[in-house]
C-alpha cells in the first residue's frame, strides 16, 4: 500500500480528525491545513473535522480556525501539516489524539508521528495535499482549491522560487479548473498595507550589504512600534533584499517582545540551512529560520553568511 493509500485508510477509519500546522502561519500552512479539512469534509461529510491554532489577523481573509476542546481529541486522528519539528507545532495538544500523522515538505530532521509522509521535492505542503487528493481521486470543493492554490503561490513566491517544479505547475493547473478567482487571490497576496510599504523603504535604506553580497537588516522593537507592525506582518518584506541584484544571501533579524530575535534567512543559490541549524532553527536549503539570543549572536550569524560567499 502506498503512503497516500495508507493515509487515506486512516482518514476513513476515524470519525473525528483534528488538523494542526506550524506557529505563525503563512499561506501554505493555512492553505494545506484548511484545504485538507475542506477536502475531507467534501468526501466524508459524516466526519467531524476541525482545524486548530492561532488565528493570524493578517491572513484572516484566507482562513479561520475552529474552536477545539480537549474532549475533541479523545479517540481522534491528528494530522500535522507543513511543520518540520515538534516545537513549532501550533497547539501542543497534538499528542492527545489516538493516532498522529505528519505531512510535510521540509527536510525530515524530526521524524515524529505514528505515520510520516515527507516529500522534500514538493514546493509546498499544499502541493502534497493536492497530489494526495488527485492520486486518490478525491473531490475538491472550490474553496479547497482556492486554499491549496494560495498555499502553493505562497511557498513558491508566485512560481519564482527554485522549489517550483514541472509537477508544481501541473498540480496548480488542476486547481485552476475550479471556480475561484485566482487572479484576485494573486492580487490579494501581492498587496500590502501602506505601513508595510514604509517598512520596505526602511529596509532598502538601511540594508547592510558586504562586498560579496551578504546582506542583513535588524528590525528592533522600536522600529516595529514606529511602523505599528507585528512580527508576523514583517513576513511581507522577507523577499525584498533579494530584489537587489548584488544581494546573494540575506538575514532579517526581528526582535521579539522578550528580547530574542527571530531570524529569517534567504538565499538565491547558496545553501544556508546549515547556518540556521547552528542557531536553533532549520528549514529549506534556500529559505530557513533561526533564533538569536543576543546582538553578538546576530553578528555571528551574519559572519557565517559572509563566510559562505568567500
Swiss-Prot record:
Its cofactor is Mn(2+); Mg(2+). Pfam families: DHH, DHHA1. Disruption phenotype: Increased sensitivity to superoxide stress inducers methyl viologen and menadione. Grows poorly in the absence of cysteine. One of its GO terms (molecular function) is nucleic acid binding. It comes from the Bacteria. Its EC number is 3.1.-.-, 3.1.3.7. The keyword Iron-sulfur does not apply. Part of the SMU_1296-SMU_1298 (rpmE2) operon. Is able to complement a cysQ mutant in E.coli. Belongs to the NrnA oligoribonuclease family. This is Probable bifunctional oligoribonuclease and PAP phosphatase NrnA. It comes from Streptococcus mutans serotype c (strain ATCC 700610 / UA159).
